[in-house]
Amino acid sequence: MNQTTIIGIAGGSGSGKTTVTNAIMKNLEGHSVALLAQDYYYKDQSHLTFEERLETNYDHPFAFDNDLLIHNLKDLRNGKPVEVPTYDYSQHTRSKETIAFDPKDVIIVEGIFALENNTLRDMMDVKIYVDTDADLRILRRLTRDTKERGRTMESVINQYLNVVRPMHEQFIEPTKKHADIIIPEGGSNKVAIDIMTTKIQSLVSKK
């Protein structure tokens, strides 16, 4: 019997995915739980020049190595440890370093495109979409990128208008239809998070 419960958590940039993920992980104390962030799986671009890498659209599904993510998840589900890739954002390509990752009772796959790939979705026991108003998402992104990543407000707004918003509308928003539950208002929706956690606890206890 499959002993690993796989949870997918998707939603736009700044929607509150991480807050929801952390709340669920905290509520599942007593079980071994780990986060497998989709951001770990940006494609290796070492074959490209640095100038070519600078043009990478990280808000497009093609930026992710879903084949490797699916392969790692299959191994983890079968009780095998894996080496998870890491990404060097300063060089815009995969790092040589990896992270040792052991099988867990619950694995949470979190990322903007967590529900976009058919094969990946089929591996998930529970699929969650965190739905947050666009105005709030851009405000959160502005705060994060200017304070934590040293970017100017102008550059963040330009990226949002020219890349993030159109990619969200074209690729991310449509994945909402695949969710088992949609959590409005992101991490502030404690009731939805509690209901979701109860569902996950029930699934884990049956395995």
UniProtKB/Swiss-Prot annotation:
InterPro entries, sorted: P-loop_NTPase (IPR027417), PRK/URK (IPR006083), Uridine_kinase (IPR026008), Uridine_kinase-like (IPR000764)
Matching SUPFAM superfamilies: P-loop containing nucleoside triphosphate hydrolases
Pathway: Pyrimidine metabolism; CTP biosynthesis via salvage pathway; CTP from cytidine: step 1/3; Pyrimidine metabolism; UMP biosynthesis via salvage pathway; UMP from uridine: step 1/1
EC class of the enzyme, as a word: transferase
Reaction(s) catalysed by this chain's protein: uridine + ATP = UMP + ADP + H(+); cytidine + ATP = CMP + ADP + H(+)
Binding site for ATP: G11, G12, S13, G14, S15, G16, K17, T18
Gene Ontology BP terms: CTP salvage; UMP salvage
GO CC annotations, alphabetized: cytoplasm
Keyword Cell inner membrane belongs to the record: no
UniProt KW keywords: ATP-binding, Cytoplasm, Kinase, Nucleotide-binding, Transferase
UniProt keyword annotation of Transferase present: yes
Top-rank lineage group of the source organism: Bacteria
MF (Gene Ontology): ATP binding; cytidine kinase activity; uridine kinase activity
The EC number(s) this enzyme carries: 2.7.1.48
Localization annotation: Cytoplasm
Pfam name, any one: PRK
Family (UniProt): Belongs to the uridine kinase family.
Annotated protein name in UniProt: Uridine kinase
Record organism: Staphylococcus epidermidis (strain ATCC 35984 / DSM 28319 / BCRC 17069 / CCUG 31568 / BM 3577 / RP62A)
